[in-house]
């Protein structure tokens, strides 16, 4: 008990992480969200680890344009705390597991949102927002003309339309499902999504 630990038995901090050796991705999600974590758990590339942090949603009501705007304003105050917590696991990348605010204000708004995140996490770590990821994916597919399906109210759909246009796409149509709450987004039946795609977006 009283013997000193030998040098051979001392636990030293690893120079290179073996968990998440290719990437440790901190995923910042709303406290109401049940979809992003579920999806990430089904997509685990070798050498990549997910680390989830939630920001509190005090106002989950999305049933009108006014309530949707209140939701956007509220999360601006709680996201920084989740980022602060996430940084303690020393991630190599930040992924924003929410999309609404990343479209707000179009291309410039997404840039400003990313800069606010940088104020918390610093200049070195990579940051992926929903809007930036959408643009990168569409460009990878060579898309020029797009139609979009969102869970948002009309005020949110306008922001998506603006962002897509400002990033160079011809936007034929944006349809919002007008989900009542932040949690109900994940409860949308697949049949409802498919119906909208086939009957309102297909051909656009």
Region roles according to the model:
Residues 113-180:
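Conserved beta-alpha
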Residues 83-126:
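Glycine/small-residue-rich loop that forms an oxyanion/phosphate-binding "nest" at active or ligand-binding sites
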Residues 74-88, 193-204:
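Short, well-structured alpha-helical segments in soluble
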Residues 16-21, 43, 118-121, 138-141, ...:
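Solvent-exposed alpha-helices and their adjacent loops that cap or buttress functional pockets
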Residues 6-80, 154-192:
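N-terminal glycine-rich anion-binding loop in soluble enzyme alpha/beta folds
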Residues 29-35, 98-110, 134, 151-156:
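Gly/Ser/Thr-rich loops at beta-strand to alpha-helix junctions
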Residues 92-95, 144, 204:
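Conserved acidic residues
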Residues 23, 48, 74, 126-131, ...:
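Hydrophobic structural segments
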């Amino acid at each position: 008990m009283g013997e000193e630990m030998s040098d051979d038995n001392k636990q030293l901090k690893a120079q290179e992480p073996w968990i998440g050796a290719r990437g440790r991705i901190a995923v910042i999600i709303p406290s109401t969200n049940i979809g992003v974590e579920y999806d990430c758990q089904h997509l685990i590339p070798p050498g990549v680890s997910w680390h989830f942090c939630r920001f509190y949603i005090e106002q989950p009501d999305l049933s009108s344009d006014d309530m949707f705007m209140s939701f956007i304003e509220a999360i601006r105050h709680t996201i920084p705390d989740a980022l602060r917590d996430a940084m303690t696991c020393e991630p190599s990348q930040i992924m924003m597991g929410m999309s609404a605010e990343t479209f707000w204000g179009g291309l410039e708004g997404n840039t400003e949102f990313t800069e606010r995140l940088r104020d918390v996490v610093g200049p070195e770590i990579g940051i992926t927002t929903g809007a930036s990821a959408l643009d990168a994916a569409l460009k990878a597919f060579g898309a020029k003309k797009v139609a979009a399906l969102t869970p948002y109210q009309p005020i949110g759909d306008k922001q998506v339309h603006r962002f897509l246009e400002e990033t160079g796409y011809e936007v034929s149509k944006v349809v919002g499902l007008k989900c009542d709450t932040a949690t109900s987004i994940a409860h949308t039946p697949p049949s409802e999504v498919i119906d909208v795609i086939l009957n309102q977006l297909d051909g656009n």
